[in-house]
Amino acid sequence: MVSFLSSSVSRLPLRIAGRRIPGRFAVPQVRTYAKDLKFGVDARASLLTGVDTLARAVSVTLGPKGRNVLIDQPFGSPKITKDGVTVARSVSLKDKFENLGARLVQDVASKTNEVAGDGTTTATVLTRAIFSETVRNVAAGCNPMDLRRGIQLAVDNVVEFLQANKRDITTSEEISQVATISANGDTHIGELLAKAMERVGKEGVITVKEGRTISDELEVTEGMKFDRGYISPYFITDVKSQKVEFENPLILLSEKKVSAVQDILPSLELAAQQRRPLVIIAEDVDGEALAACILNKLRGQLQVVAIKAPGFGDNRRNMLGDLAVLTDSAVFNDEIDVSIEKAQPHHLGSCGSVTVTKEDTIIMKGAGDHVKVNDRCEQIRGVMADPNLTEYEKEKLQERLAKLSGGIAVIKVGGSSEVEVNEKKDRIVDALNAVKAAVSEGVLPGAGTSFVKASLRLGDIPTNNFDQKLGVEIVRKAITRPAQTILENAGLEGNLIVGKLKELYGKEFNIGYDIAKDRFVDLNEIGVLDPLKVVRTGLVDASGVASLMGTTECAIVDAPEESKAPAGPPGMGGMGGMPGMM
């Protein structure tokens, strides 16, 4: 294994996983394809068909009585889920023009999920509602650019209205309520997340993993989180969550940039010999060193991830020191006698597990001595007592202390089958993201109620022309669709109930419809709440993409390749004086 690693590294500048890297002697090969084009009404109609198809699949999951979607998978059992972004990502349409529209909605769902962590189904419903009305108005002769300006004007007014009426959450009960709503009414998940947040605090770290028992478990362990992610997406081990997850890895820390293969070759060989993943945290990892890591990962020879060290200057040095104490490793810098290319097993640290995303890294159950970790915390507290420190320096020290001394809550999802565990895990992750969003920006009345009340504010917005007025009207109608969809999924008359809500309780912001008890109530009192961040992000993302699609005048896709006709049968030989038959 060691010699194989070494020999593979020597060929790095030439090839990575069978792909030629452009170099001094590389000759780029350009391949062209024929294109199909559609214009005007035809283009927008095809996009709308794709948007509508995907939105219908996603919208059935919205609300406490939304339905599940069954998704076939290339490997393993079919997936059962109510997670909007999972449903959206699984859709691929045969018609390429329609698939363009579906892919744009997938981008909306993915972006909303990335920013807010929840609300993807609402964003999808809003995208369809805004785009369908925009297409209808453009077909009637309206100026698409003015419609877009009107839509953006209305969205700005709605966001301003929602921010003025949001409220902060402070109690564990409110956190449980937000989580319960996001988990489709599962009070067990709500209580579990509230308990986890109570254990580690609102700024604490909570992660979700698959458990090995039938019941769910909550475990609080020592660990650290810092805001640096993987350098390259080639390191990802879980494609769905876009994460790198390792168990019992070795950890290499360096204060300097790592570029040469020789710098990390001993550490790669040590990890290969012990059959353990390797985590490299350095000022930067690039050049042949990065290529070596990627090549070994892609070939399956070694699980490895490279991460930039957190912080800058002296703060980076201190944080690497904290990581060294936590993981029982050495930091390779000018102060150590041994250079990184001569790393020995005792120079590498370890931990129970590590999770790396595009933006941050979580290290759990470091192998460092508890006494040394506590001594390091006391040392930081001693430095903080210096009266000559600036506010910035105190803030950074407090941040280091919180990372080093704070625990990490791990929710282990249990179940009797893989399908059940995955479905429940999706709901817990959504609920966790909703709770984080609620804590950061506050909450609003749920079930689409805040959008319905905001729609009543859009009647008197001044605009420059009639087409912009129609753009405002598009948003006014569209933002009532989430509430209507939630009601329709529960088997109720969505239009009728939303109309009554506007007419009877238009001026009472917190009054909404309780589906469980079939009556109008104060949603704050019964705990039906939506995070402002989720609602706001979904509306902004949906309106931006939908109004932009409305300005489309031409759509271009790859033309299908023409299949070559099979050769005809050979002619029959002549008989006697007769000619052959063809």
Curated annotation (Swiss-Prot):
GO terms under biological process: mitochondrial unfolded protein response; mitochondrion organization; protein folding; protein import into mitochondrial intermembrane space; protein import into mitochondrial matrix; protein refolding
Span list, region Disordered: 561-582
Cysteine pairs bridged by disulfides in the record: none
Compartmental location: Mitochondrion
Annotated organelle transit peptide span: 1-35
Entry keyword set: ATP-binding, Chaperone, Mitochondrion, Nucleotide-binding, Phosphoprotein, Stress response, Transit peptide
One cellular component (GO) term of this entry: mitochondrial nucleoid
GO molecular function, one term: protein folding chaperone
Residues found modified as Phosphoserine: 77, 92
Gene3D superfamilies: GroEL, GroEL-like equatorial domain, TCP-1-like chaperonin intermediate domain
Pfam family for this entry, one: Cpn60_TCP1
The keyword Nucleotide-binding is annotated on this UniProt entry: yes
Keyword Phosphoprotein: yes
Gly residues bias: start-end ranges: 570-582
Family from the record: Belongs to the chaperonin (HSP60) family.
PANTHER family, A to Z: 60 KDA HEAT SHOCK PROTEIN, MITOCHONDRIAL
Function: May participate in assembly and/or disassembly of proteins imported into the mitochondrion. HSP60 are ATPases and have affinity for unfolded proteins.
Protein name: Heat shock protein 60, mitochondrial
Source species: Schizosaccharomyces pombe (strain 972 / ATCC 24843) (Fission yeast)
